[in-house]
Each structure stands twice: as C-alpha cells, then as structure tokens.
Regions:
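Accessory terminal regions of nucleic-acid processing enzymes
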Residues: 1-171
Length: 171
C-alpha cells in the first residue's frame, strides 16, 4: 500500500480549516432559529451500519419544531469561468453526495450547507461569495437509499477482502 499524501499544509486546506469556525459563528448569528452544538472530531455512526460515519461541522436543532439537522461548511475557489457551471442553479455532485451520506449516518431531517466561494473577477479583483442551501431529507430519500446501497456494497468488499471493480458504475 502507498501512504496517502498529507495535504494538511496545502494553502486551500489551511484556509478551510481556519475559516470553518468563523463561518460557523456567522451561521449562528444569521440563523437564530437554530440551536447549534459543535464537538471537534465527533464521529456519528449509522445505527444499523456502524461503518457509515460522519464528522459534522455542526449539529442543529430547529427551534419550535425540535427537528434535528446538521451544518456542513465548505470553502472553495473557482479558478475559471467554467467552474461556475458546477454551481449554476445547483450544488456540485460531491457536496450533495456528502450531505446525503451525512443524513444517512445520522438520521437528520435536513442539512444546512454553507459554502464560501472565492474567485477573481475579470477585472482582477479578489472576491468572496457565501451561499446557503437547505437540503431536506424528504426531498432526497431515493439518493440516500442509493448512498446506503453503495456503502454496504463497498463494505462487503472490505470485509471479504475483495478488490472492487476498477471501473465505477454510472450514477
């Protein structure tokens, strides 16, 4: 086996780690309708499949309804005009898949996704844009089921010490 590359010193990773507590605090200020808890390095596990885990950026409780949800914080940088296409009227697939995975692992009813996008304008000005998305579990039940099915299949390869197919199936 080859040890994975340590990316902890990369500027983008450092920025994301440093920005996360500040973005969490801004979210709390902007959304008094939630109670929020954060425990660093907390690992939450699926009740039936303990190999399905997540480490939340925040746990939310909706005031008045007591609906439980999560907060996911992302920082990203768009380096070209084509990068905006991934954000046009949607969130990128990898972020959506992670949110579905979190709802699967935790049973949450929703996830609030807070994204800070850094970019440079055509005039050369550095800018930041913060976007907020609320993803409801009820709206993505089929996708959560697909994530569960895929995770269980992958884990079967691990427990049976089998190498999975090299070509990924279409999603």
């Amino acid at each position: 086996l080859v040890a994975p590359e340590d990316i902890g010193d990369k500027p983008q990773v450092k920025y994301g780690n440093d920005a996360e507590p500040l973005l969490r605090a801004f979210f709390a200020l902007d959304h008094p309708e939630y109670g929020m808890a954060f425990t660093p390095f907390k690992i939450m596990r699926h009740e039936k499949h303990p190999f399905i885990t997540c480490t939340p950026d925040g746990e939310l409780l909706e005031t008045g309804t007591d609906r439980r949800g999560g907060l996911e914080i992302k920082t990203t940088e768009i380096m070209s005009s084509s990068g905006w296409g991934r954000w046009k009227d949607r969130i990128p697939d990898e972020y959506y898949a992670q949110v579905c995975h979190q709802m699967l692992a935790t049973g949450w009813e929703y996830v609030e996704l807070l994204v800070q996008i850094k970019y440079t304008t055509t005039a050369g000005e550095d800018r930041k844009e913060v976007r907020h998305y609320k993803i409801e579990r009820a709206d993505c039940l089929d996708d959560i089921a697909l994530v569960e099915q895929s995770a269980v299949l992958f884990w079967s390869y691990v427990t049976e010490r089998k190498r999975p197919a090299l070509k990924l199936p279409p999603i």
